Amino acid sequence: LHKAIRRQRQMCIRDRICTYIDSHFREEIHRDELAELVYLNTDYMSRMFKKEKGVSISNYILQKRVDEAKKLLCGSSIPINTVSLHIGYSNFSYFTKMFKENTGLTPLEYRRKFGEETHV
């Protein structure tokens, strides 16, 4: 019974963190503010999140940003530097590096390969 209660609590905490990140991923998010949100020690919260989601908090945020960038790159003609700013990266070079590490393509290459104009 105790394991079931603990598991339910961990799932609830994970869901609260994910909901917060999903709503605020365009902003700078710090682990300590997430820990305050769920009333946990920062390190414990990070370990628990990774155990529950299979990915670290920073990688979860990165994936949310990359997914949003993909949508914007494919579904609009918004300049790539504006896409970078929209998803929370003020440093365009860093955005390009993170995007390429995650997708294997630069944002421009991704747009050329998967953008709307290539499917017309």
Residue ranges and their predicted role:
Residues L1-I13:
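Single conserved hydrophobic/aromatic residue that forms the stacking wall/gate
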Residues Q8, E33, R65:
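Ca2+-coordinating acidic residues in Ca2+-binding motifs
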Residues M45, F49, Y94-F95, F99:
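Short hydrophobic/aromatic patch on the recognition helix
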Residues K97-V120:
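…primarily DNA-binding HTH/wHTH and HhH modules…
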